[in-house]
Amino acid sequence: MNNVIALHNIHANVRASFNFEEKTPQIDRTAYIHPLAAVIGNVHLGKRVMVAPAASVRGDEGQPIWVSDDVNIQDCVVLHALETHANGELVREAVVEVDGEFYGVYISERVSLAHQSQVHGPAFVGADTFVGMQALVFRATVGKNCVIEPKALVMGVNVPDNRYVPAGALITTQEAADNLPTISEAYPLKGLNKAVVHVNTELALGYRKQNNVIHLAA
């Protein structure tokens, strides 16, 4: 893992009453961050992560923000979280717990965050899930192999594995989340996330290589 501090769009957070430490993003060498994206503070980006133009991954208030391997963060996506510490103490209701560790936002492996979507912590998104264009996940957990269709809102609930949220739906009660439809073989978007992950991991590696070539030629 590398501490990347040379680029103006990738830098440490500032100290504040809710965040006593300056932390620099931890970024795998195979991840790619577009120069017009911002990655700030206590953030982990795993292998082959793609961060597209105008995306913001900001671990300066709620933190840490963890992005696992093979995740794509598309154009204008926002990852941010509510204050996770107050006077040096953990705000328990403002974090999600994964394997005994606490996070403002946790994005699992092979998740797609499509254009203009937002995941605002405390929030967890399970592996192989697709979060559609302009969708919002806030104070919620989303299981694995799910699809959040465009412009849907998921707030204050736990979405079970293998469910989809219809486009434009407002899911704000646990009853509504529990009654979401299961993804079947006939569901039109069943294979979408796998295809999107395939494209974006290849783009991350390609742009990373191109970026290295440009620096060598400079």
Where are these regions (language model features)?
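Glycine-rich hexapeptide-repeat left-handed beta-helix
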Residues: N2-E22, Q26, D60-D69, Q74-V105, ...
